[in-house]
Amino acid sequence: MDNYQELAIQFAAQAVDRNEIEQWVREFAYQGFDARRVIELLKQYGGADWEKDAKKMIVLALTRGNKPRRMMMKMSKEGKATVEALINKYKLKEGNPSRDELTLSRVAAALAGRTCQALVVLSEWLPVTGTTMDGLSPAYPRHMMHPSFAGMVDPSLPGDYLRAILDAHSLYLLQFSRVINPNLRGRTKEEVAATFTQPMNAAVNSNFISHEKRREFLKAFGLVDSNGKPSAAVMAAAQAYKTAA
């Protein structure tokens, strides 16, 4: 009979081959959202106009969603022409395509700094409006009103501060998830949170933007002070999430 304990010990004693492991990491790499690749594709397809086009795509993502063909059905003639041009120029897809394809949501997430700034202007055109959020927590921070905000969160903040920011952001995600997914409307807070916690944490812990730059963004947004302490509005939203149903 095999001695499985001994086999496990012998296996652990084998030398670690760094090159072999790195090769496997490349082979098994997640073929989904990659902010660097998104920006690379934007520049490749858009040339000198990529930044202006990206701004348009962010507005579309925030106000109309991730399905450009469907949104064109109810849009002005000028708007349809603009969206059609973007679809053709950037080969925009819907759903969850390969790593080397663009969607409106991916553009908004990759350029989260710009997306969060646009939210201040567009908050009343979102699926869950700023007015609605103010009803849940006074002066709810507009910069937090999109899933891409998680990419701006500095994970090196002190634990209590980090938790408060994530809870405040989760207050929006809770409402947003129930609006865009009817199947979640009768679910508990914990059940709904289970659908957005993993992608939120993945964005927080990504290495695309440094901790220092993220902290600068949070300060510029008025969400934390020079010590990383959350603002009163953030703390109020965090408390509202804790007591939300």
Swiss-Prot record:
Stretches for region Essential for oligomerization: 1-71
Site label Important for dimerization, positions: 125
Gene Ontology CC annotation, any one: viral nucleocapsid
Keyword vocabulary terms for this entry: Capsid protein, Host cytoplasm, Host Golgi apparatus, Host nucleus, Ribonucleoprotein, RNA-binding, Viral nucleoprotein, Virion
Pfam families: Tenui_N
Sites where the protein binds RNA: 30, 33, 66-67, 70, 99, 105-106, 185, 195
Subcellular location: Virion; Host cytoplasm; Host nucleus; Host endoplasmic reticulum-Golgi intermediate compartment
Highest taxon, organism lineage: Viruses
Cell inner membrane as UniProt keyword: no
InterPro entries found in the cross-reference section: Capsid_Phlebovir/Tenuivir, Nucleocapsid_Phlebovirus
RNA-binding listed as a keyword: yes
Stretches of the chain forming a coiled coil according to its record: none
GO molecular function, a single term: identical protein binding
Oligomeric form and interacting partners: Homodimer. Homohexamer; ring-shaped, necessary to form the nucleocapsid. Homopentamers; opened pentamers in solution. Binds to viral genomic RNA. Interacts with glycoprotein Gn; this interaction allows packaging of nucleocapsids into virions.
Family to which the UniProt record says this protein belongs: Belongs to the phlebovirus nucleocapsid protein family.
Function field: Encapsidates the genomic RNA, protecting it from nucleases. Displays high affinity for single-stranded nucleic acid. The encapsidated genomic RNA is termed the nucleocapsid (NC) or ribonucleoprotein. The ribonucleoprotein has a non-helical structure. Serves as template for viral transcription and replication. After replication, the nucleocapsid is recruited to the host Golgi apparatus by glycoprotein Gn for packaging into virus particles.
Domain comment, as recorded: The N-terminus is involved in homooligomerization.
Protein name: Nucleoprotein
UniProt source species: Rift valley fever virus
Phylogenetic placement of the source organism: Viruses, Riboviria, Orthornavirae, Negarnaviricota, Polyploviricotina
